[in-house]
């Protein structure tokens, strides 16, 4: 286990180096018409949804390390296929999207379960601290990769994917130096595994934690969808690409800082307080994007607030995972996290379909703000009264761990 802890943080940094993040849409548009670019995105999201839960079950059944090795190998292949693509290479780009989706699906939940299993009996606050450091390094890596990715666009866009292939290969090599964490129980057959996860949901704290994260996936993604138009309103067509790249870099740096605050916030305000503060911040951000449509000065405010769009997720990640994984059996940790992610993606898809009913961006953002406020009220209701955020409940099944 010492080898795992020795190489884990360098691995998480390398795994976060996706240099193509700020330029991938432009990269696609340079090779394909917009309609086919949207088809590529649909292929990616469909593959992620299809692989999300099976990859979690695979991790619980076969092992954490093999699952992460598959993830990194898929990312290497994906990046090389992207780099090799040329104008009109839809099939090659679609294959690259499939491998990219597999890479992210096989990482989802398994990285957290790997660290939690490695720490074994010492998990808890130690896991929370290490997960916070891991998350912080991941955001720092994303910030650095975004800055270099923008430079790659000027020099040679394919370089961003070649650098990503190299970093993913390096992460793969570090995984080879690690060992599979010992577990006394393996995952059951798929249907039985699903029944066990649903049984875990009978714990009031578990379903509240899962529901909160799934709902926040929706709220976190709204700024990603509507930030680009706000940046365009502020900087114009000519500079929107550069502005978006700089904005991404600073947003990731702030998220890295917030990730390190997670354990402190939890110890100071309790888990309920930390999650509610995260919900409140995102609600204010979504409301500011709506107000930005009406007033130019609010566009500046919204863009400034959007620098912190990843901070709530970063701050809540370690406390939330520590609380949830401590209540889940070792044979279904990755499956539960995958189900949580799948639920969030499904809710976000339904939200997009709902917003599409209104063709005007102003109306869409008004509805999104309304949904954010409703979720905030539900969070206050189910995570604890606003005046008693730090209160520790008496019954484990009815109260969130503080």
Please place each PLM-identified region on the residue numbering.
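Juxtamembrane intracellular "pre-TM" segments in multi-pass secondary transporters
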Residues: 1-2, 178-211, 400
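Conserved MFS/SLC helix-loop-helix module at the cytosolic interface between two early adjacent transmembrane helices
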Residues: 50-87
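Helix-loop junctions on the cytosolic side of multi-pass membrane transporters
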Residues: 117, 164-189, 383-395
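C-terminal transmembrane helical hairpin of 12-TM major facilitator-type secondary transporters
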Residues: 272-316
């Amino acid at each position: 286990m010492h080898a795992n802890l020795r190489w884990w943080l360098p691995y998480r940094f390398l795994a976060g180096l996706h240099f193509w993040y700020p330029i991938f849409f432009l990269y696609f548009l340079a090779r394909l018409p917009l309609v086919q670019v949207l088809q590529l995105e649909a292929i990616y999201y469909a593959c992620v949804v299809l692989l999300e839960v099976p990859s979690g079950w695979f991790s619980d059944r076969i092992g954490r390390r093999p699952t992460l090795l598959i993830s990194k190998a898929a990312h290497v292949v994906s990046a090389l296929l992207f780099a090799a693509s040329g104008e009109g290479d839809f099939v090659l780009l679609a294959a690259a999207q499939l491998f990219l989706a597999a890479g992210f699906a096989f990482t989802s939940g398994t990285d957290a379960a790997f660290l939690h299993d490695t720490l074994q009996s010492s998990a808890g606050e130690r896991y929370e601290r290490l997960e916070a450091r891991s998350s912080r390094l991941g955001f720092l890596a994303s910030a650095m990769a975004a800055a270099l990715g923008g430079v790659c666009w000027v020099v040679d866009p394919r370089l961003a994917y070649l650098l990503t292939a190299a970093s993913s290969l390096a992460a793969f090599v570090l995984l080879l130096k690690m060992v599979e964490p010992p577990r006394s129980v393996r995952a059951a057959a798929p249907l039985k595994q699903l029944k066990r996860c649903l049984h875990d949901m009978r714990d009031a704290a578990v379903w509240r934690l899962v529901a909160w994260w799934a709902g926040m996936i929706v709220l976190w993604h709204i700024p990603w969808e509507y930030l680009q138009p706000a940046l365009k309103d502020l900087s114009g067509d000519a500079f929107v690409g550069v502005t978006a790249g700089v904005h991404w870099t600073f947003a990731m740096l702030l998220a890295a800082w917030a990730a390190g605050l997670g354990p402190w916030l939890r110890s100071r305000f309790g888990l309920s307080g930390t999650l509610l503060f995260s919900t409140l911040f995102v609600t204010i951000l979504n409301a500011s994007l709506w107000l930005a449509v009406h007033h130019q000065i609010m566009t500046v405010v919204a863009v400034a607030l959007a620098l912190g769009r990843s901070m709530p997720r970063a701050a809540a990640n370690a406390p939330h995972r520590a609380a949830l994984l401590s209540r889940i059996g070792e044979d279904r940790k990755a499956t539960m996290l995958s189900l949580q992610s799948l639920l969030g993606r499904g809710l976000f898809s339904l939200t997009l379909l709902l917003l599409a009913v209104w063709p005007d961006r102003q109306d869409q953002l008004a509805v999104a703000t309304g949904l954010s406020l409703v979720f905030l009220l539900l969070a206050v209701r189910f995570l604890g009264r606003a005046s008693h955020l730090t209160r520790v409940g008496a019954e484990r099944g009815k109260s969130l761990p503080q």
